[in-house]
Amino acid sequence: MKKLLFIPFLFVCLAAFAQDITNTPFGKGIINLKSKDNSWTTKVAFRFQTRYDGEFDFSDSSFSDRAYVRRARIKGHGYAFSPKVQYKFEYDVHNGQVLDAVIKWNFAGNWNLWFGQTKMPGNIERVFSSQKLQLVDRSLLNKYFTLDRDAGVQLRHKLNLGETFLVRSKLAISQGEGLNRKAWSSGNSYTGRIELLPFGNFTKKGDYFASDLKREETPKLMLSVTYDYNDNATRQGGQMGNDIAGSTRDLQSWQADAHFKYRGLSFFGEYANRVT
């Protein structure tokens, strides 16, 4: 008996392309695209920060150290349909969690409405991006008193008084439980912040990065106050901290900060108070 054996072959044609040359310079994102009709843009970037700690104990002359990845982030932003509808996202590669996922709508003049998860309008140091810090990390005040990130809605407005004086106001209603919390909440967090800039805007949004990299030619100052009321908070610090076992509590937080820059000199200071 004769048997016929069929052996199928799959032929795949692969095309080789030369390496593309991009016009995007270093520091302007891995992906930086814009549609021909200007209906959308997107910019995606990646960054990481490593850290080394060394500790010497004089009591027993012992030394210990460690090296690790402090942060690794993928972040992007752009607009869709119109420059008045912007979006921002940020993903923490190191810890595997979404940090920011927010839509920003400029619905009228100097009015903006934000919806999603992002940083709360709290102390200035927390709103500094980690890539724009002057020191290796944020302060202990920020660790224990920050409002951090939360999911909700924010209303923002800016008002010019005279030629230079600028007033920015920010209101937020959020779930009050912090980053990536999906549990049902019995209360919300209500936040208000006002920022006074008597000498006008900082160069290139310099009020929200630490050192005076742009070397302000004229003095620039921002004075700010924040109030937050967290109703029926389930965590010790509101948006941060350990869960409160079997109970909730109301938290009131006051924060004040000042930021000054002039010709390479920079200063910022913060005050925070929290009561139950």
Kindly give the residue locations of the regions a language model identified.
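Detector for outer-membrane/organellar transmembrane beta-barrel domains
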Residues: 185, 195-198, 203-276
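Short, charged, low-hydrophobicity "junction" segments
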Residues: 18-23, 165-170, 242-243
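Outer membrane beta-barrel
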Residues: 29-179, 183-200, 219-222
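Bacterial Sec-dependent N-terminal signal peptides
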Residues: 1-21
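Short, surface-exposed charged micro-motifs
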Residues: 23, 102, 257
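Outer-membrane beta-barrel biogenesis signature
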Residues: 17-44, 201-220, 233
